[in-house]
Amino acid sequence: MNALERLEKLLDKEQFEKVKAIDNPELHEFLAEWIEWLEPDKVFVCTDSPEDEGYVRWKALYYGEERMLETPNHTVHYDNYYDQARDKANTAILLPGGKKLPYINTKDRDEGLKEIRELMKGIMKGKELFVCFFVLGPKNSIFTIPAVQLTDSAYVAHSEFILYRKGYEEFKRLGRSARFFRFVHSAGELDERKTSKNLDKRRIYIDLEDETVYSVNTQYGGNTIGLKKLAFRLTIKRAVEEGWLSEHMFLMRVNGPHGRKTYFTGAYPSMCGKTSTAMIPWENIVGDDLTFILPVNGIARGANVEKGVFGIIQGVNPEDDPIIWQVLHSPVEIIFSNVLVKDGKPYWNDMGIEIPDEGENHSGKWWRGKKDAEGNEIPPSHKNARFTVSLEHFPNVDMEALENPCGVEVGGMIFGGRDADTWPPVREAFNWEHGVITMGASLESETTAATLGKEGVRAFNPMAILDFMSVHLGDYLRNYLEFGRKLKKTPKIFAVNYFLRENGVWLNHKLDKAVWLKWMELRVHGDVEAIETPIGYIPKYKDLAKLFKDVLNKEYTKEDYERQFKIRVPELLAKIDRIEEIYRKLDNVPEELFKVLEEERQRLLEAREKYGDYISPFALEGE
């Protein structure tokens, strides 16, 4: 029996007709094999119709994975108390012959596939399987990658309808030519709160060879929403093989003089200011997380992989995040996850208003002072609690850029690190190679006391992508360098650091980043000059003073400028030593990396000879 004949036996007539309409034997074989293996009681195939999406939304409520809140279209979902984040220990890239890659949790492919198949055999008995079709990137475009998701979680399917563009018609259009990703997920057995029960058997395995990801015994979005960070591993590999970039970056529009629109991408490790940069109220957002960048006629063009936001809700407050706050209080479709609910209203940590002393949260019935099994006090919401919402509901979204099948020209790329004493607030690279190596490939994030218990530890995180890397870091960087060489017009590269401190005091205010963005926009078009330093170009005082007045209506003093933009030679040299040591331990790193780092070291040493350890920007401007 061929796959279609098997599917005709497995599906009811209506669902079978939906699958049959897609002329792709490879898809049919995949569906037949997994429906037979998972043994669901019922299968629902989603087309692009609003009715099918509505069915999934209803099933999330019907099966108890989501519950309605007071505001229309708002629902809440809870994950198991111990299923609240990406499970790094049980997430592995499957590689043949037990191959290993630096910084990546790998597993022998044959072993991994055998284990996951055993865990998934018959796991959907008594459950409904949803077959959903989506695309990564805008539809019918150079960026489009089709994907099919199998899941028994209506919550996961519902999340994907909010976050991704529907792809059923795209599968029909592409037919046999579709090179599609596959995702197979089961939440496994559920407890009385409808959360995954068998967390000891939680596995997330990424099979690069078949471009398939398996996820089992988990519901948390980062482990289960196939098209997000799971697909990201697949697209990184595809991009390296095909010569484009799949990046952990926001995509935003910065509005320049006389109505000029300039687009920037930005890669920042967590807690480094990525979302707050992308959400500056008077600029425009295209995407907050993942960006594809392709070379088109010698120009780098970027597109948002997604169409929605799966955002961290902790700390969202009306003063610092007016746009997100406004969206979260509108009657638009939103899934809140792992927040506190009292009388149908959601509450979360550090929201800037009074939080009730009791209610329900990810731990079940909650009261202030409640402790978990380990004796830790349980906060009102989990620190990784989320909101899932479509970007179309953001007043500052650039819809035209979001849906443009040609993407937008990338004028600048920003790498955002976090340290108290090394990088200046903003600088521009001398050229593509210098930016890729001394900014992107050298990205570090200084941990705060809250995250690791040790303040001031610098975590190496090149391009903010290390957690999701699926190829050798050397191959990834080689592709980056090559990508720039292919372009007739390379985006300018910038590095930012919002976290400088002196004697324990912050040197910058939260909104100063709005000024750095405007300066970068002017530099992309050559509208202002800059000061050449050993580590790149920095702004001139007069330009920043004008921008602070224009953008923030603030006086900007020469003292502030000097403190922020002095070149800190000892710290910069120590950083080069750290980064070089890391890359020396890896094989297969482009030789160019060491050459560019050495050139920077020599420039710093020469400058120290002339000016000393700490160099005023005014001294360099006078040259």
Swiss-Prot record:
Q: GO cellular-component terms in the record?
A: cytosol
The UniProt note on temperature reads:
Optimum temperature is 80 degrees Celsius. Thermostable. Half-life at the optimal temperature is 53 minutes.
| Active site annotation, chain numbering | 272
Q: Please give the NCBIfam families that the UniProt record associates with this protein.
A: PRK04210.1
Q: Which UniProt keywords apply?
A: Cytoplasm, Decarboxylase, Gluconeogenesis, GTP-binding, Lyase, Manganese, Metal-binding, Nucleotide-binding
Gene3D superfamilies reported for this sequence? 3.90.228.20, Phosphoenolpyruvate Carboxykinase, domain 1, Phosphoenolpyruvate Carboxykinase, domain 2
GO molecular function (one): phosphoenolpyruvate carboxykinase (GTP) activity
Give the E.C. number(s). 4.1.1.32
Please give the pathway this protein is involved in. Answer: Carbohydrate biosynthesis; gluconeogenesis
- Where is Mn(2+) bound in this sequence? 229, 248, 289
- The source organism is Thermococcus kodakarensis (strain ATCC BAA-918 / JCM 12380 / KOD1)
Gene behind the chain: pckG
**Kindly, how does the activity depend on pH for this protein?**
Optimum pH is 7.
Name of the protein described by the UniProt record: Phosphoenolpyruvate carboxykinase [GTP]
| Function, as annotated | Involved in the gluconeogenesis. Catalyzes the conversion of oxaloacetate (OAA) to phosphoenolpyruvate (PEP), the rate-limiting step in the metabolic pathway that produces glucose from lactate and other precursors derived from the citric acid cycle.
The subunit field of the Swiss-Prot or TrEMBL record says:
Homotetramer.
What's an example GO BP annotation here?
Answer: response to starvation
Mind telling me which HAMAP family this protein's record contains? PEPCK_GTP
The family classification in the record reads: Belongs to the phosphoenolpyruvate carboxykinase [GTP] family.
A Pfam family this protein belongs to? PEPCK_N
Q: Where found, per UniProt?
A: Cytoplasm
Q: Does the keyword Ligase apply?
A: no
Required co-factor(s) are: Mn(2+)
Binding annotation for GTP: 271-276, 386, 418
Which reactions are catalysed by this chain? Answer: oxaloacetate + GTP = phosphoenolpyruvate + GDP + CO2
Q: Which domain of life is it from?
A: Archaea
